[in-house]
């Protein structure tokens, strides 16, 4: 069911990153009420730019590391909800691409996403009297088919797809819908220099960038289109400047 972003309150985790910042710029053009950006590193110039694009949108920044204990996330969310009262959409966008950092890759790309999602359910879950909400999780095309030289990163993104698909099926119980946006190779600092697992391919970043890529601006525009389409359970592929729904093949059914 499509949605308008006008007057919506959005929390964007990692909304100042490569794709994140361009997406934040597109979001404020949609006349949000509040854009709350959570990121590890403050960027006052970027925040000022977002405010200048559309002064009607209240843009707020809070420092946030997704690897903190879930109790810290809940505490931060209480502060945010006390200020904006309601939150309509959570975008989980934190990610690193460095298979030398195995534990941190898993902590940022998957565990942190799960914990942030779990924490906001305290405020949204209709079983607790909550109003429900929408979760947009950023995955990657590597969640469909791995870049085998970075198996840790690829594994976390496959986990994001499965976790989010489960959230979508739980919507009748929780009132919270969910979908993934999965960018292809996008020209950002994330892919300019990174490390393969056990250095199996020292030139992996150069080889990836030799393939067809997309600018982050094109990815951001399709990102916001996917948010506006608001299709529960959707698995969106954002590759080479296009937006395409993925039809997931079922090879097994739990039967429950």
From Swiss-Prot:
Q: Which gene encodes it?
A: Adh
Q: How does it assemble?
A: Homodimer.
Mind telling me which InterPro entries this protein's record contains?
ADH_Drosophila-type, NAD(P)-bd_dom_sf, Sc_DH/Rdtase_CS, SDR_fam
| Any Pfam family | adh_short
| Gene Ontology CC, one term | cytosol
Q: Which domain of life is it from?
A: Eukaryota
Q: Lineage in the entry?
A: Eukaryota, Metazoa, Ecdysozoa, Arthropoda, Hexapoda
Which residues does the entry assign to the active site, renumbered to this chain?
A: 153
Q: What is this protein called?
A: Alcohol dehydrogenase
Q: Which terms are listed as keywords in the entry?
A: NAD, Oxidoreductase
